[in-house]
Amino acid sequence: MIPVRCFSCGKVISNYWDEYKRRVSDGENAAAVLDDLGITRYCCRRMLLSHVELVDVLSPYQ
């Protein structure tokens, strides 16, 4: 699950995750997608760039 807010500045970033993931999986450049979405702060950019979905990996162990 993507965090709702950026850990550093507190900006809401979770509403960008679905579109970011879809467009990057379609082959667009991640930096261009972030620029297009208006995410300019490097702290917010790293939240989306470095996020890894672990829910599906960890769910069998509960």
From Swiss-Prot:
Tell me its cofactors.
Answer: Zn(2+)
Q: Where in the cell is it found?
A: Cytoplasm
Per the record, the domain of life is Archaea
| The entry's keywords | Cytoplasm, DNA-directed RNA polymerase, Metal-binding, Nucleotidyltransferase, Transcription, Transferase, Zinc
Q: What is its EC number?
A: 2.7.7.6
GO molecular function (one): DNA-directed RNA polymerase activity
Q: Where is the signal peptide?
A: none
User: Which cystines does this chain contain?
Assistant: none
A GO CC annotation recorded here is: DNA-directed RNA polymerase complex
**InterPro entries linked to this entry:** RNA_pol_su_RPB10 (IPR023580), RNA_pol_suN_Zn-BS (IPR020789), RPABC5/Rpb10 (IPR000268)
SUPFAM superfamilies from the UniProt entry: RNA polymerase subunit RPB10 (SSF46924)
In the record, biological process GO terms are:
DNA-templated transcription
UniProt remark on cofactor binding: Binds 1 zinc ion.
Listed under catalytic activity are:
RNA(n) + a ribonucleoside 5'-triphosphate = RNA(n+1) + diphosphate
Q: What does this protein do?
A: DNA-dependent RNA polymerase (RNAP) catalyzes the transcription of DNA into RNA using the four ribonucleoside triphosphates as substrates.
Q: Which family does it belong to?
A: Belongs to the archaeal Rpo10/eukaryotic RPB10 RNA polymerase subunit family.
Quaternary arrangement and interactors, per the entry? Part of the RNA polymerase complex.
Q: Please state what the protein is called.
A: DNA-directed RNA polymerase subunit Rpo10
Q: Which organism is it from?
A: Methanosarcina barkeri (strain Fusaro / DSM 804)
- GN (gene name): rpo10
